UniProtKB/Swiss-Prot annotation:
The modification Isoleucine amide is found at I41, I65. A pyrokinin potentially constituted by residues Asn-158 to Gly-170 has so far not been detected and might be completely absent in ants. This is CAPA peptides. It comes from Camponotus floridanus (Florida carpenter ant). Keywords: Amidation, Neuropeptide, Secreted, Signal. GO terms for cellular component: extracellular region. Residues 23-29, 44-54, 68-181 form a propeptide. It is found in: Secreted. Residues 159-181 are annotated as: Disordered. The keyword Secreted applies. GO terms for biological process: neuropeptide signaling pathway. Periviscerokinins mediate visceral muscle contractile activity (myotropic activity).
């Protein structure tokens, strides 16, 4: 009975694929999953007939601050037709009323120092303390004492043979590797 069910299932699959015209799937289809060549839901055919405007809206052809090459500004409107002057009138406003006389008076005073102006201008903050001088003279003597310097060097070496314990961090040679395996 099991063989009959399997045989009937195979016949149904073959029959259903023949009804579907047996469309062959391409194995090398490079399109990403989910991307289809037709418009998304909610897009109508009017968008495809929508023509783009030749004029860039909202862009104003004025030189940027700090650019002084006059030859590059000869034909600013060569590619775009600025038929509407409303944009230019909106953005080209007089800046004089925006500046308050109080600010101009304050900026011209020499008393108006910023915090950065009060900082040291030389590179003395990069120098170590012993060049400028120590606040504690005994501390300076300890640092400059050669006996202290050599004792620090002697203590920094591996003291495993002198009773100190240093854990082994890894295999030191090939013999240790062979013994480990």
């Amino acid at each position: 009975m099991q063989d009959n069910r399997f045989f009937i299932l195979m016949i149904l699959l073959v029959f259903s694929t023949s009804l579907n015209q047996g469309q062959k799937l391409k194995a090398n289809d490079r399109r990403s999953a989910g991307l289809v060549p037709y418009p998304r839901i909610g897009r109508n055919s009017e968008i495809s007939s929508f023509s783009r405007s030749e004029r860039a809206l909202g862009l104003i052809h004025q030189p940027r601050i700090g650019r002084s090459d006059v030859s590059s500004f000869d034909n600013l409107n060569r590619f775009h037709d600025l038929s509407s002057d409303a944009d230019i009138e909106f953005y080209a406003m007089d800046m004089d009323p925006l500046l308050s006389p109080d600010y101009e008076d304050y900026a011209s005073k020499p008393i108006a120092l910023k915090y950065a102006d009060k900082l040291q201008k030389d590179n003395s903050w990069l120098m170590p303390d012993h060049i400028h001088g120590y606040k504690d003279f005994h501390f300076a003597q300890k640092i400059n004492d050669p006996r202290l310097y050599y004792s620090i060097l002697r203590d920094s070496r591996n003291t495993q043979g002198q009773g100190g314990y240093t854990p082994r961090l890894g295999r030191e040679n090939e013999r240790d590797t062979a013994n480990f395996l």
